[in-house]
C-alpha cells in the first residue's frame, strides 16, 4: 500500500531543495535532479491542496453554507 503524502513534509523538502539549489554548489546534473524532484513535490503539494479544497467545498455545500469568501480580498 502506498504511503499517504505528507503535505507539511513536502513543504519542508521543497524548502531544502530550494536552499540547496540557491547555494550554487551543485553541478548541472545535480541541479537538474533537484529541479526534477522539486517539480514532482510541487505537483504532489498542489494535488493535496486541490483535494483539501474539494473536501471543504463538499462539507460547506452539505451545510448549505454560503459561498462567500471574506478572506478573498486580503
Swiss-Prot record:
GO biological process: DNA catabolic process
Record's keyword annotation contains Heme: no
Keywords in alphabetical order: Cytoplasm, Exonuclease, Hydrolase, Nuclease
InterPro entries xrefs: Exonuc_VII_S, Exonuc_VII_ssu_sf
Catalysed reactions listed for this entry: Exonucleolytic cleavage in either 5'- to 3'- or 3'- to 5'-direction to yield nucleoside 5'-phosphates
Annotated localization: Cytoplasm
Gene Ontology MF annotations: exodeoxyribonuclease VII activity
GO terms for cellular component: cytosol; exodeoxyribonuclease VII complex
Pfam families given in the database record: Exonuc_VII_S
UniProt key word Metal-binding: no
Source organism superkingdom: Bacteria
EC number: 3.1.11.6
Signal peptide region: none
PANTHER family linked to this entry: EXODEOXYRIBONUCLEASE 7 SMALL SUBUNIT
Protein family according to the UniProt entry: Belongs to the XseB family.
Subunit composition and interactions: Heterooligomer composed of large and small subunits.
NCBIfam families, per database record: PRK00977.1-4 (NF002140), xseB (TIGR01280)
Role noted for this protein: Bidirectionally degrades single-stranded DNA into large acid-insoluble oligonucleotides, which are then degraded further into small acid-soluble oligonucleotides.
HAMAP family in UniProt: Exonuc_7_S
Name by which UniProt lists this protein: Exodeoxyribonuclease 7 small subunit
Organism annotation: Ruthia magnifica subsp. Calyptogena magnifica
Lineage summary: Bacteria, Pseudomonadati, Pseudomonadota, Gammaproteobacteria, Candidatus Pseudothioglobaceae
